[in-house]
Amino acid sequence: MFKRFVLSLAFLIMAAVVSFQVIFTVPEHPQIITQTGSEITEDIRCIEFSGAKALDDNGELNLLVWNIYKQNRANWQSELELFSADKQLLLLQEASMTDSFKQWLVDGSWVSNQVSAFKALGSGAGVISIAQKQPIKACAYTSKEPWLRLPKSALYSQYRLSNGESLAVINVHAINFTVGTEEYTSQLSALETLLKQHSGPIVFAGDFNSWSEYRITAMKQALREANLREVQFSPDHRTQFITGLPLDHVFYRGLTLKNAKAPQSDASDHNPLLVSFTLND
C-alpha cells in the first residue's frame, strides 16, 4: 500500500513538472521585446534608441497604470482603448503578447517594450511599457517567485522630455508569494538603486502586491532613498486584498501632480489607475 502511494505521488510530481515545462518557458536571461509598428525585435536585458523625441504633450504627461490580467476578460480591448485615450504612457502588468494585443499596438501606433519574463503556451508575459514615443533606453529585470519559480518582472526606461530633462520610469510587478518580506524588499531595493544616478523626474508604478502591513512598510522603506511621493487617488477604487490594502501604487518625483483617479472596470481583476502630471519649469 505504501509503495503504491509513493509511486502515485512520484507520478503526480513528474506529471506536474512535465506540465509546467510544457506550459511555461523561462528564458535564461531577462529579455526585452520591442514592437514598433509591426516590427518586433528581441534583445538581452537592454536596448537603446537614438533620436528619441519628447514624450510629453506640451508639458502634459498622462499615464495609465493597469494590471490587465493577461487580457483574459472579453472586454479588455474596449476598456483599454477607453482608458488609454489621451495618454502618452501606459504601464501594464500581466500583459500577454497575443496576436490580438500585438495588433492593438499596431493600430494605435504605439511603441512598446516588454519584459519577456516567461512564455505561457508560446505567448510572452510580463510588464510592458507602451508610449507614443521611443524611450532613450529600456532595461529588463526579473526576480523569481520563491515558491512558484516563475519570474516577476520590472522594466526601467528613460524618456526624453520637452523641458530638456529625462524621465526615469520603473514599471513593476512585485513578487507575491513569500512568507516574510526578504525577497520582496530585495526586488524593490534593487530597482530603487537604479534611480540613484538619475537626477531628473521619476515615476515608479505598478502592481506592488502590497497585501500586508509588513509589505507596505517594506515597500516604503525600499523607496525612501529616492525621495518619492505617493500619488493619492480620488475616487480611489484601487483593487484591494482581503486585508483592505491596495495592491497598485504610483510614486513620483520632480513632476507636478495634476489629478489621479482609480475608476472601476470589469475588464481585469485590477482596476486601472489614471494619473496626470505637468512638467516642472
UniProtKB/Swiss-Prot annotation:
The keyword Cytoplasm applies. GO terms for cellular component: cytoplasm. SUPFAM superfamilies: DNase I-like (SSF56219). It is found in: Cytoplasm. Its main location: cytoplasm. GO terms for molecular function: catalytic activity. NCBIfam families: PRK05421.1-2, PRK05421.1-3, PRK05421.1-4. Belongs to the UPF0294 family. This is UPF0294 protein VP2298. It comes from Vibrio parahaemolyticus serotype O3:K6 (strain RIMD 2210633).
